[in-house]
A protein has these predicted regions:
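Loop/turn positions that initiate beta-strands
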Residues: 102, 152, 157-159
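Short alpha-helix capping/helix-loop boundary micro-motifs
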Residues: 91, 98, 144-151
């Protein structure tokens, strides 16, 4: 699997319409950027309790999802921006159904590994000034995902995102999200057991699987 990168993006602290600060708005870079253990150089996180760190170093939110959002939000001006949902990588031809936890991708000189789905938060609704967006993501599974950085390196727009190793797991980002974040997600005991012990899945999501398994009496 090889997909072309339309843009690499970083965010700075800025005021949201409600007056609170966030770095969710990501803007395309004009040249190469170093991708380190904590993400792209210059990319900031204001809410470090819920964002950032090695397991959430690089975020990809599929730009193709913006078309679905237009059906819900209309022609919202933010939907023209590839970084509107906080993503660092803009691609069209890739989504949560095609990417599996633990898969590794080469991006320029950097090596990335899929670590977890992205859990939506209210910052999205505050940025767009629209209620119901978090619930829509939870129901639809259009969540995006995070990479951890296995090997640091430089990349730029126009490079390709190339899958270089199979995770050995058939579990897609969407499957994890729908099982553990979707309110209607069924408590499949076998899947919960698998997720609870899947080493390449970020610890926070393994803990979600353990908790759901306990609630289900497993």
């Amino acid at each position: 699997m090889t997909v072309s990168i339309a843009a690499l993006m970083i965010g700075r602290s800025a005021l949201l319409p409600d007056g609170k600060r966030s770095a969710i708005a990501k803007h395309p870079l004009a040249g190469p950027v170093r991708i380190g253990r904590l993400g792209l150089d210059g990319d900031l996180q204001v809410d470090k309790r819920h964002h950032g760190g090695p397991e959430m170093a690089v975020h990809l939110y599929p730009f193709a999802h913006h078309a679905c959002w237009r059906e819900q939000l209309g022609d919202h001006p933010l939907l023209a921006d590839p970084g509107a949902f906080g993503g660092n990588i803009a691609v069209d031809a890739l989504d949560e159904t095609q990417v599996r936890i633990g898969e590794r991708f080469r991006l320029g000189e950097a090596l990335l590994e899929v670590s977890q789905p992205r859990m939506p938060c209210a910052t999205i609704e505050r940025r767009f000034e629209r209620k119901g967006m978090v619930a829509a993501i939870l129901e639809s599974g259009r969540c995006g995902w995070y990479f951890r950085v296995v090997a640091e390196g430089v990349a730029q727009a126009g490079d390709s995102l190339v899958r270089v190793t199979d995770s050995g797991s058939e579990i897609t980002v969407r499957a994890v999200f729908m099982a553990l974040a979707n309110p209607s997600g069924a408590a499949d005991p076998a899947l919960l057991e698998r997720l609870a012990t899947l080493p390449c899945l970020a610890e926070e999501w393994r803990d979600k699987a353990i908790a759901k398994r306990r609630r289900a009496g497993g």
